[in-house]
């Protein structure tokens, strides 16, 4: 299963996951490995941009969910 992604893609996914998860040591680890594999800064920027968009959508949906819960006083499922 680990071989399903090539090493460059694996590191870009790691960069995106680290960005979305706010893990600076994880980002640095995958960033260094990605550069060693020849990943371009444009590719890194694309992964970070995508991660930020995913994170922002999740944050927005969670805020909306919390607001609904607080205004309806309905117990959580």
Q: Where do the protein language model's features map onto the residues?
A:
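Hydrophobic alpha-helical segments
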Residues: 1-77
């Amino acid at each position: 299963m680990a071989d399903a992604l090539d090493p460059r893609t694996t590191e870009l996914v790691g960069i995106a996951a680290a960005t979305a998860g706010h893990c600076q040591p994880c980002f640095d680890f995958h960033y260094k490995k990605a550069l060693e594999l020849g990943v371009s800064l444009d590719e890194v920027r694309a992964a970070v941009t995508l991660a930020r968009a995913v994170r922002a959508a999740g944050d927005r949906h969670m805020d909306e969910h919390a607001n609904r819960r607080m205004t309806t006083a309905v117990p959580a499922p």
